[in-house]
Amino acid sequence: RRVLREMVGHLIVDASEEKLGDAIAELTKSGNRLNVNLLGDNEAEHRLSETKRLLARDDVDYVSIKVSAVSGPHQHWAFDEVVEEAVRRLTPLYELAASSSPKKFINLDMEEYKDLDMTIEVFTKILDQPHLKDLEAGIVLQAYLPDTLAAMQRLQAWAAERVANGGSSIKVRLVKGANLSMEIVEGVMHGWPVTTWDTKQAADTNYKRILDYALRPEHAKNIRLGVAGHNLFDVAFALLLAEDRGVKDRVEFEMLIGMAEQQAEIIRRRVGHLLLYVPVVNPKEFDVAIAYLIRRLEENASSENFMSGIFDLATDEEIFKREEDRFMRSLNSVTDEVPEGKRHQNRQTENADNVFVPAGRFENTPDTDPSLSGNREWGRAILERSKTTQIGIATLKENELTSAAEAEQLVADAEASGKVWGRLSGAERAAVLRNVGKEIALHRAELLEVMAAEAGKTLDQGDTEVSEAID
């Protein structure tokens, strides 16, 4: 563990009181600012208090935090409750930033796609509080999601109204995205489309599409932009675009500490200062930094990523041409269209014509995706109906057995039906069972309603069981 800490000490800073101050002083001596992000898997209360302790330091004026850092593992069906709790718990941190002199900055980090709506909702609800209207704060958006430009436009509309009402502008930190593996796993496990762009070039194009939108003067006045990344072509493009449009003062260039430091220094000289993303971790909890380090290794190792060739860029014409061609292909693909997200499941509009049925060979039926607002509304309605549900009661009464003769008749009927079933071919039985599966799918809501009423099943528990029955 000690050897590993020494190997990656330039990427992650020791959060202990006796070492953090010297590290901050060293990183800021050239004029750079720091965005301090506390790594760790401690309970939410500890994460929040430690982040507050960091923000209260005289040498820290900018921190990052995630919704999950204060809510812990949360159930996405309980969207409203999680948002309300996160707002309640995060507000004192924002109040500390607002009451500091000068004001300090809090950046709300984005996690996986399933947290996109929730993070935006928490962010806007915190800053909608009247006593925080003059506080500038930030949020992260990930360009590898097709939904991101629409999310940026949503934030732009909200920020424009905020500024028009005398409030402060906000900041968006634009990144490519670093949770691809988790997005793939999430999609495969539940039978959902993977949320990210299908190719790296499409993600790069989306990054430039969002830069083009964000760096228009009428937008930049409401949202300051953090251009986060190490791709020198993208950095140069953003800088020249901002200068050409007269909004350079509304752009901040951001990089990770310890990554491509020579190139970062050249950019710092050109733009004035960099905002360095500084992960800090308590030495006793160093294991939690492994995930962060793995993501950095992936970025450096994959030939699709710019970082894989950054040290050969100036000396290897082939590497330079490769990156130049990638940049031009992505730039030439930029359009004004607002891409749609990859997931469109909506249980509210499901019917016999569009319910999922495998076209050929067996496929697991997709679970309900609670990251989509239509599905969450559908789930809320189920829970509300479950309080007074009467489903199945009439059927029970109609089929109640009141005598031994009725029981014997039922057994005889079942025996006769079994003989009919036995005469069916395999293909005929399969057709019947496929229809049964379809009918179960069409009655998913009713089944969940009864599960909740009779067994106290939560939506996340019941929904997967309905999917298993369909399969």
Residue spans of the language-model regions?
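Positively charged, amphipathic and often flexible ligand-engagement surfaces
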Residues: 1-359
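Terminal low-complexity tails and localization/encapsulation signals of metabolic enzymes
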Residues: 272, 283, 288-438, 442-453, ...
